Regions:
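LRR N-terminal entry segment and analogous cap-like coil->beta motifs
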Residues: 1-68, 82
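C-terminal capping region of solenoid repeat domains
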Residues: 1-7, 11-16, 22, 132, ...
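Concave beta-strand-loop units of leucine-rich repeat
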Residues: 25-32, 53-58, 81-85, 96-99, ...
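Intrinsically disordered, low-complexity repeat tracts enriched in Pro/Ser/Thr
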Residues: 30, 43, 73, 104-106, ...
Length: 175
């Protein structure tokens, strides 16, 4: 695992960066990878976690599946996963896990989510509280944009970022 800005093990990072009340953990640019996220998913200190920032951590679908299956991290309101390696399978794991039923903010900017991942988010019966969704610089294309535009789940969405995600002019009109 490449750790250019971090030499600490994830256990130490939790102690350093978990807010005093235990609701916010900011580990952006710590390069914890899937192994680190698997540790977080089992970490009892994170029982009250509401905001998790894992931007730029070399996380793949494997790590997202661990988070989706966590019996500890079940109350997240904000999930930052920008600039990782998450594909449709990771988006589907988020869309299908009751752990994310309180989410009002998801940042998946600059990952590898395609139309199937966008469709999974759009059709999720779990992500009903979502207010902000960032799928910019992925590859959702017109098909994914259409699913997002027609979604009943995302009816309360206030912000949708999808620039640089492979939409044609026709796809943009759907939104």
């Amino acid at each position: 695992m490449n750790k250019p800005f971090n030499d600490d093990p994830v256990e130490v990072l939790v102690k350093k960066f978990l807010s005093r009340n235990g609701t916010v953990l900011d580990l952006r640019l710590k390069y914890i990878g899937d192994e680190g996220l698997e540790y977080l998913a089992k970490c009892p200190e994170l029982i009250d976690l509401e905001v998790l920032n894992l931007g730029r951590n070399e996380i793949t679908d494997k790590g997202v599946r661990a988070l989706a299956g966590s019996s500890i991290i079940t109350n997240l309101k904000e999930l930052h996963l920008e600039k990782n390696e998450i594909s449709d399978a990771g988006a589907k794991a988020i869309a299908g896990s009751a752990n994310f039923s309180y989410l009002n903010f998801i940042n998946l900017w600059k990952n590898k989510v395609g139309a199937e991942g966008a469709k999974a988010i759009a059709s999720s019966t779990i992500l009903v509280n979502l207010k902000s969704l960032d799928l910019a610089q992925n590859n959702i294309g017109d098909e994914g944009a259409k699913a997002l535009a027609e979604s009943n789940t995302l009816a309360g969405l206030e912000l949708l970022e999808i620039f640089g995600s492979g939409l044609t002019d026709e796809g943009k009109k759907q939104l």
